[in-house]
């Protein structure tokens, strides 16, 4: 069984293996397919129309399946690799270990945001940004520039305390746990982290930055934590809702899985705190 660990506890060998598997997916072209898929859903998901991956109840199960697909791709390269998670409520600064040169590399230079160190820096030659909106083919970051602070544990706790999964109108205006975790309302959790990292992470092509996977692995963990705290509160909406994915509806682009199929993460992996 795959165990997803806090990135802060990874050994040097675990970091090396994760990075090597990510680089191999990039070299083979498979990595960029994940970027293309994510961007297509960011563009297509709207508050007033069909919405699947974002600003909708299926934000959490959609990304759970998306991360599972990526994790399986990594494991096809190296069976020992699991997705680590980044607890940004604890590792809150640009000096945190995940930004070190032996793992993800650090922030970008002030001139153009170009990441200058680590395995994904343009100078290393292994990480061209191919799925992009402009001519800049290098990984960019500006940690803590567009927004200064990452979410705190107290802010996370305030969202975990919400007893209702989601509410009408089932979009970025909704009340409830999902929308506050996604970050369109309230203390702005998930969305704020994308903006804090900056560069490609602040765009629909956010998976171009490998930190995307660690960020979403933690968002996924928070969903599991919420489920444990609110065993009587299930996924909503249940049925008959236009434009969104109900509990037993199939999710695009896979069309073979529903939110109901993904409610129990332990069927696929566990966290180091489970």
UniProtKB/Swiss-Prot annotation:
What's the cofactor? Cu(2+)
- Its domain of life? Bacteria
Report the outcome of residue 190 to N.
Loss of activity
User: What outcome follows a substitution of residue 216 to Q?
Assistant: Loss of activity
Respond yes or no to whether keyword Metal-binding is given for this record. yes
SUPFAM superfamilies given in the database record: Di-copper centre-containing domain
Q: Which InterPro entries match?
A: Di-copper_centre_dom_sf (IPR008922), Tyrosinase/Hemocyanin (IPR050316), Tyrosinase_Cu-bd (IPR002227)
Residues bound to Cu cation B = 190, 194, 216
* NCBIfam families hit by this protein: TyrosinaseMelC2
What does the UniProt function comment say about this protein?
A: This is a copper-containing oxidase that functions in the formation of pigments such as melanins and other polyphenolic compounds.
* Family assignment from sequence similarity: Belongs to the tyrosinase family.
Extra remark: The extra- and intra-cellular tyrosinases are identical.
> What is the protein name stated in its UniProt record?
Tyrosinase
- This chain's source organism reads Streptomyces glaucescens
């Amino acid at each position: 069984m795959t165990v997803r660990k806090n990135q802060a506890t990874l050994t040097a060998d675990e970091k090396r293996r994760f990075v090597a598997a990510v680089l191999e997916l990039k070299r083979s072209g498979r990595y960029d397919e994940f970027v293309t898929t994510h961007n297509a859903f960011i563009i297509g998901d709207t508050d007033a129309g069909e919405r699947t991956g974002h600003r909708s109840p299926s934000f959490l199960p959609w990304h759970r399946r998306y991360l599972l697909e990526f994790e399986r791709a990594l494991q096809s390269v190296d069976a020992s690799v699991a997705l680590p998670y980044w607890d940004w409520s604890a590792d809150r600064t640009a000096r945190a270990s995940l930004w070190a040169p032996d793992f993800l590399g650090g922030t970008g230079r002030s001139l153009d945001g170009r990441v200058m160190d680590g395995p994904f820096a343009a100078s290393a030659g292994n990480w061209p940004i191919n799925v992009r909106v402009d001519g800049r083919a290098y990984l960019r970051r500006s940690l803590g520039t567009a927004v200064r602070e990452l979410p705190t544990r107290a802010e996370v706790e305030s969202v975990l305390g919400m007893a209702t999964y989601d509410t009408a109108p089932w979009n970025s205006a909704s009340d409830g746990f999902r929308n506050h975790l996604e970050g369109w309302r309230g203390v702005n959790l998930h969305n704020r982290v994308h903006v804090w990292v900056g560069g490609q992470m602040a765009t629909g092509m956010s998976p171009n930055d490998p930190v995307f996977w660690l960020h979403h692995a933690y968002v996924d963990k928070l969903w599991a934590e919420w489920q444990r705290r609110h065993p009587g509160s299930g996924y909503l909406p249940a049925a008959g809702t236009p434009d969104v994915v109900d509990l037993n509806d199939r999710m695009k682009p896979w069309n073979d899985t529903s939110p109901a199929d993904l409610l129990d993460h332990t069927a696929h992996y566990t966290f180091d705190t489970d």
